[in-house]
Design a protein with these regions (language model features):
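N-terminal Sec-pathway targeting helices
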Residues: 1-14
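Solvent-exposed, non-transmembrane regions of membrane-associated and secreted proteins
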Residues: 20-256
Length: 256
């Protein structure tokens, strides 16, 4: 009888070990695959385009930035490229209005992955553009995707990295960080700031109220603010010090 119990326990542990090993192998395979894919995309972006190749028209007034044109032809859900120096944040940014959260669990190649790909909230208009462009990205344990935003919790990092780059398909853009804060979502708690609900300001007061709340919650004073008429960029990722926590970096456009 004891031998049967012992064998059953060994079998159970073996099954658990096999399943756990399978998950780990899958995770590391996915990690390596995603890293290789994005490294290849970065190589395209950082390679000088051929001078003989004419850029495509994006609209009647604008043409594609050549290196982004090539990626757009691979996946026309691409709306831009984001980069933060001294982090792993160097990625295409996607938007799928028909399937808003598609890139939460799909990569640039549209294949399923836990890593996802940074993406713009569906009600943000990249063409106008909206007053506030909100981009989401996962906080991955290997430091990829938007995990690098965690560095902004340290004021000394911000002091050396006061701007982020977010290019559209047609314009190179630089944003200046105005606030970095932690909040919670999916709750009616008074600690919850629904920053993701602010996309367009109907009045000067709406815009000012949003910016003031961001500044009030900021982990430190950047000495920078924004005024009605400025264009904002809000970067959001998970923050694990509390349930449903988020770390948010808000910046304003300073060139286009």
């Amino acid at each position: 009888m004891k031998n049967k119990i012992y064998i059953a326990i060994i079998c159970a542990f073996s099954i658990v070990f096999a399943v756990s090993s399978g998950f780990l192998i899958k995770h590391y395979y996915d990690s390596a695959k995603q890293a290789e894919m994005y490294d290849n995309l970065i190589e395209v972006v950082e390679t000088e385009p051929e001078e003989t190749k004419e850029p495509m028209n994006y609209s009647e007034e604008k043409t594609f930035i050549p290196e982004y044109q090539e990626l757009y032809l691979q996946n026309n859900d691409m709306v831009g490229w984001i980069k933060v120096e001294d982090t792993k944040i160097n990625y295409p940014v996607m938007q799928s209005k028909d399937n808003p959260n598609f890139y939460l669990k799909h990569g640039f190649d549209k294949a399923y992955t836990d890593y996802g790909c940074p993406y713009v909230q569906e009600n943000c208009d990249m063409e106008l553009p909206s007053d506030n462009i909100i981009i989401y990205g996962h906080h991955m344990n290997d430091g990829s995707m938007f995990a690098g935003l965690m560095k902004f919790k340290d004021k000394s990092f911000w002091e050396k990295h006061k701007t982020v780059s977010f290019d559209t398909l047609t314009d190179r853009q630089t944003y200046e960080v105005i606030a970095v804060f932690k909040t919670v979502v999916y709750t009616d708690s008074p600690d919850s700031f629904k920053y993701y609900q602010f996309v367009n300001a109907e009045t000067d007061e709406d815009f000012t109220s949003y910016v003031e709340k961001c500044k009030e919650l900021s982990l430190y004073d950047t000495g920078v603010t924004a005024e009605y008429g400025d264009k904002l960029l809000t970067l959001s990722t998970c923050e694990y010090s509390r349930t449903n926590g988020r770390l948010v970096v808000v910046a304003k456009l300073i060139n286009e």
